[in-house]
Amino acid sequence: MDYTLTRIDPDGENDRYPLQKQEIVTDPLEQHVHRSVYMGKLEHALHDMVNWGRKNSLWPYNFGLSCCYVEMVTSFTAVHDVARFGAEVLRASPRQADFMVVAGTPFTKMAPVIQRLYDQMLEPKWVISMGACANSGGMYDIYSVVQGVDKFLPVDVYIPGCPPRPEAYMQALMLLQESIGKERRPLSWVVGDQGVYRANMQSERERKRGERIAVTNLRTPDEI
């Protein structure tokens, strides 16, 4: 079997994943200005209600590649209880899953399989890259490892660490829920371009920059 990879350019034309590229549609908040007060508020309320249901019933695709998957499964235990976020229903079929967690090392031979499974997922769908190997290849800078899942899949949330703790995975779920809550998708069936609006979410590093700079007393490692 011949394995091929399709590299993604998020800023260019994307025929393979047209719904996952950076959307060029108008900001829905600006569109409300040109509508009546009643219809604008009604549509806004419907979007909020649909997004609330989506973000609180995220079903993950049971797909692990390496040691990061062990940390992901740990979040399902009673200590962490990821069921609080509505994401405890593991799916064995991509057609029943809402988002895929690529937890582990994406080998070149496995990349086409990951891509095919992602294509089998139904819209709306999201991707979480978990761990240094999935983010950038990690310590495996070799021919057999893809240097980042975002080389062939659109990634919504990155989780740093080698491996990241279960708390990091749950924080990624919360960030994904926050992003889903700001999305705007068609409320009915649409053929062709659906005009999905995704908010430009700020990275955690930039969001907490002011908080880090304001720290005056640094704690020792045994106090953290």
From Swiss-Prot:
[4Fe-4S] cluster binds at C67, C68, C133, C162. One of its GO terms (cellular component) is respiratory chain complex I. Keywords: 4Fe-4S, Cell inner membrane, Cell membrane, Iron, Iron-sulfur, Membrane, Metal-binding, NAD, Quinone, Translocase, Transport, Ubiquinone. Its EC number is 7.1.1.-. It is a peripheral membrane protein. Binds 1 [4Fe-4S] cluster. InterPro entries: NADH_UbQ_OxRdtase-like_20kDa, NADH_UQ_OxRdtase_20Kd_su. Its cofactor is [4Fe-4S] cluster. GO terms for molecular function: 4 iron, 4 sulfur cluster binding; iron ion binding; NADH dehydrogenase (ubiquinone) activity; NADH:ubiquinone reductase (non-electrogenic) activity; quinone binding. It comes from the Bacteria. The keyword Ribonucleoprotein does not apply. PANTHER family: NADH DEHYDROGENASE, NADH DEHYDROGENASE [UBIQUINONE] IRON-SULFUR PROTEIN 7, MITOCHONDRIAL. NDH-1 shuttles electrons from NADH, via FMN and iron-sulfur (Fe-S) centers, to quinones in the respiratory chain. The immediate electron acceptor for the enzyme in this species is believed to be ubiquinone. Couples the redox reaction to proton translocation (for every two electrons transferred, four hydrogen ions are translocated across the cytoplasmic membrane), and thus conserves the redox energy in a proton gradient. Belongs to the complex I 20 kDa subunit family. This is NADH-quinone oxidoreductase subunit B. The gene is nuoB.
